[in-house]
Design a protein with these regions (language model features):
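Conserved acetyl-CoA-binding loop of GNAT-fold acetyltransferases
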Residues: 92-101
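Conserved beta-strand-loop-alpha-helix junction that forms the acyl-donor binding cleft
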Residues: 78-88, 104-109
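Glycine-rich acyl-CoA binding loop
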Residues: 53-58
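A generic structural signal for beta-strand entry/edge sites
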Residues: 37-39, 75, 108-110
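Acetyl-CoA-dependent GNAT
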Residues: 1-50, 61-63, 67, 71, ...
Length: 125
């Protein structure tokens, strides 16, 4: 959660919690204007297991992307673990596409995904 891309500080990182009643059901971390101006980089998004498989994550992502578009962001970007087909399916369902890039480190390989943002047009597919 403390990992930062080059040129960014903790002040650039945003942590967002999503609740249902009094219960925290999802969390997201993101950095705005990275890797380029107008891009919102989603570092992670996790939904409580009790809320998975019911469309909750998709609803949250639609609302979050709409809020980002309203703030002037024009693109959302993230990177999935190459070995996580569930993550890939979730983000594809939510309008993200693979960029064709592959990023590797000592731990895993990651596949960047992106989707354009337009205020008023960020409902799930």
């Amino acid at each position: 959660m403390a990992a930062l891309p080059p040129g960014k500080t903790l002040q650039d990182k945003h942590y967002v919690g999503f609740s249902q009643g009094d219960a925290l059901i999802a969390v997201m971390d993101l950095i705005l204007d990275y890797p380029s101006p107008g891009t919102a980089m989603i570092g992670f998004f996790m939904v409580d297991i009790s809320c998975q498989g019911r469309g909750t994550g998709t609803q949250i992502i639609a609302q979050a992307l709409e809020a980002l578009a309203a703030q002037g962001m024009t693109k959302a970007r993230l990177a999935i673990d190459e070995g996580n087909p569930q993550s890939r399916a979730f983000w594809l369902k939510n309008g993200f596409v693979l960029t064709g890039e592959r990023i590797s480190n000592d731990i895993a390989a990651y596949l960047p995904m992106e989707r354009p943002l337009r205020h008023g047009a960020n409902e799930p597919n």
